[in-house]
Amino acid sequence: MRVAFSILLLVSINLWGAKRNPQPVIEKPFAPLEAARTMQVPEGFKVTLFAGEPDIRQPVGFCIDDRGRLWVAEANNYPDKEGGKRDRIVILEDTDGDGRHDKRIVFYDKLEYVSGVEVGFGGAWVMSIPNFYFIPDADYDGVPDGEPVVLLDGFGTHANSHTIANGFAWGPDGWLYGTHGITNWSLPGKPGTPKTKRRRFEGGAWRYHPVRHEWEAFATGTTNPWGVDWNEYGHAFVSNCVNPHLFHVIQGAHYEPDRNRPTGRFAYERIPTIADHLHFTNTKTIRAGIGTPEEDVAGGGHAHSGTMVYLGDNWPVKYRGDVFMNNIHGRRINHDRLSRNGSGYTASHAPDLMRAADPWFVGVTLAYGPDGGVYVSDFSETGECHHRHNTRKQTGRIYKITYGKPKPWRGDIGKLGSVELAKLQSHPNEWFVRHARRVLQERADSTLGQAAIQSELNHLLASSSDTIQRLRSLWVLHGIGELTAKRLAELLRDPDEHLRAWAIQLLCENKRPSGAVLDEFLRLAKSDESPVIRLYLASAMQRLPLVKRVPVLTALLARAEDATDANLPLMYWYATEPVVAADNKAAVQLLAACKLPKVRQFITRRMATKER
């Protein structure tokens, strides 16, 4: 996504089949209610207007809080990076359950260049470039308890207005995740950190821990990712504004395209998209097909925004676990279906979920709420992504897509008791699961109900036959600090590959696994039959000192069956490269053991390179 994603949409009221002939630009959007009424969705679905101008303008992102309210980031400055403090966060609430907001609070209106908002841990987390802020509001009454606190600065806008840091979403591991475009590389750090102690980040996925206040790159690459979400196994996915459109995000990975990123120059090859298709037709001139019948059939165009893995309980079950993203030029919501492929996934094209008739529709963010319905924000403007001036700042909408008659929900997850929150880990709507997990993490220092929830969750972790239920219990126990290294080590021998995999990741969170754990890693590297386990081991090795990586890497590189996997040879290489660069003896050992042709080539190439 590009933050303005403005689409130079030429008038073709024959929306889906027009030839791309020069036409005058549409000067006005459809009225908000008309725009919702004319959206095409499958039988049984309906689209309603949740909010529109003048109550909302230029919604570049939103999140949903524990009460089901939408906190919306309004990018009034876009694309003027020097426009002053005019961006704001607005809270919208539907108090009577009719599907329309009827209460509006301006939470904060002095932001510089906003691109994301999330709520939790007593306030709002806001990306307002060049700064990443925390705005305290302990009781979430919509009135800040104090001035914004700059957690990090150094986020870039030097190259253009759009490929910037954005987000956010709470991950299953208790970190706050965001995404970042390629051209506006950043040097994030706490205020006052000298440039020499900052690490350049050139785009991809990153995360920030809300308690320890640590920032780290999670994966690098893609072009301009916007939005991150997880499936039920805790595997992350991002959509990409510019071709290709969908990636399975693996910790420590480097993704295509290369684009001469200097910090990844020894990656040599990057992990490709998981999509087996494109949503556009001309790979040499990506805009050439916009508006043609062929492009319409393919999916609408090359630019995407927002990532949602649907895990709600309102839409039909056939949509559960599928990935949805806004298609900017196609004015629609694309739909990809995931299937396992070795250590990762393949994403296949499924019928579009929604098509908008309004030529100003610019979908940005997608998220399902407590009733399982999906909110879609519409930036509502024209122009084609890279424009330097935006005179159409008075519009913006948020729609809601539901199936049948969803049951309205009113409540406050934050006011539930800890035992009730633990029981919500069995809820069919992942919205409740995630919010309850985060609130329990916030209460980790409290003794209130801790013994009871530990008992409940440990019982589910030990005795449930449901992988998803066990993972949910695992993540909560980790978030509240009650998952011991001993228990995680025991899970390395669990019969379920997903429990073994997450045990590997969580044992390496502090980058200090014990010698006994490393021995278990070596056993898994040699003999575990699951490619998912080997993928998690490859990620984990990147978090360890070089000398401690060598035994496990030696075993992984000997797994000849992994040569054709889309992820494993490259992930093995990303963990191996620093060892080869630093230790010639270890490099020789790894080369001798390696049965993967691609990695053998990379080791030899790196050994011949003088630069260290």
What are these regions (language model features)?
Residues 17-423, 431, 439-441, 484:
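Beta-propeller domains with acidic blade repeats across secreted/periplasmic ectodomains
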Residues 377, 394, 401-612:
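Long, ordered, helix-rich scaffold segments
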Residues 8-17:
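Hydrophobic h-region of N-terminal signal peptides that target proteins for export
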Residues 1-8:
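Sec-dependent signal peptide recognition
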